[in-house]
Amino acid sequence: MPRSPSKTSPRKGSPRRGSPSRKASPKRGGKGAKRAGKGGRRRNVVRRRRRRRESYGIYIYKVLKQVHPDTGISSRGMSVMNSFVNDIFGRIAGEASRLTRANRRSTISSREIQTAVRLLLPGELAKHAVSEGTKAVTKYTTSR
């Protein structure tokens, strides 16, 4: 017997039986579905924490605001500055390490850092860097 047209055509807005529905029904198996034979317990989902990316960004921004309060910096500019600081840090640390080994010592002191800065940076820039570094170390030791 042929079926009536109302039985074969689905109602407006509802999906056909057997075809996948757009909304995931709680009865069907999915990521959050209960497993049969487990006593109705749900498995604890362990969420991975996002790894923290270390950056000098906040410090670069603070220095920028001290020097030019009305100036901003783009994320690309911040990335360049961060790379620059990491590069200089690595160079100074490497040079200070070589100086420490050359003097047969096991600890990098402020003196090695100062000498490394003098060796790496040219002329006036080295003088200003040493004076600012000395000022920062003095401020730190007096605040302790």
Curated annotation (Swiss-Prot):
The modification Phosphoserine is found at S14, S19, S25. One of its GO terms (cellular component) is nucleus. Keywords: Chromosome, DNA-binding, Glycoprotein, Isopeptide bond, Nucleosome core, Nucleus, Phosphoprotein, Ubl conjugation. Coiled coil: none annotated. Residues 1-51 are annotated as: Disordered. Monoubiquitination of Lys-139 gives a specific tag for epigenetic transcriptional activation and is also prerequisite for histone H3 'Lys-4' and 'Lys-79' methylation. Phosphorylated on SPKK motifs 3, 4 and 5; which may regulate DNA binding. Dephosphorylated during maturation of spermatids to mature sperm and rephosphorylated at fertilization. A motif (SPKK motif 4) lies at residues 19-22. A motif (SPKK motif 3) lies at residues 14-17. The keyword Protease does not apply. A motif (SPKK motif 5) lies at residues 25-28. Residues 24-51 have a biased composition (Basic residues). InterPro entries: Histone-fold, Histone_H2A/H2B/H3, Histone_H2B, HISTONE_H2B_site. There is a cross-link at K139 (Glycyl lysine isopeptide (Lys-Gly) (interchain with G-Cter in ubiquitin)). Glycans are attached at S131. It is found in: Nucleus; Chromosome. It comes from the Eukaryota. A motif (SPKK motif 1) lies at residues 4-7. The keyword Endoplasmic reticulum does not apply. SUPFAM superfamilies: Histone-fold. A motif (SPKK motif 2) lies at residues 9-12. GO terms for molecular function: DNA binding; protein heterodimerization activity; structural constituent of chromatin. Core component of nucleosome. Nucleosomes wrap and compact DNA into chromatin, limiting DNA accessibility to the cellular machineries which require DNA as a template. Histones thereby play a central role in transcription regulation, DNA repair, DNA replication and chromosomal stability. DNA accessibility is regulated via a complex set of post-translational modifications of histones, also called histone code, and nucleosome remodeling. Contains 5 SPKK motifs which may interact with the minor groove of A/T-rich DNA sites. Phosphorylation of this motif may regulate DNA binding. This motif is reiterated in both termini of histone H1 and in the C-terminus of plant H2A, but its presence in the N-terminus seems to be unique to sea urchin histones H2B. Belongs to the histone H2B family. The nucleosome is a histone octamer containing two molecules each of H2A, H2B, H3 and H4 assembled in one H3-H4 heterotetramer and two H2A-H2B heterodimers. The octamer wraps approximately 147 bp of DNA. This is Histone H2B.2, sperm. The lineage of its organism: Eukaryota, Metazoa, Echinodermata, Eleutherozoa, Echinozoa.
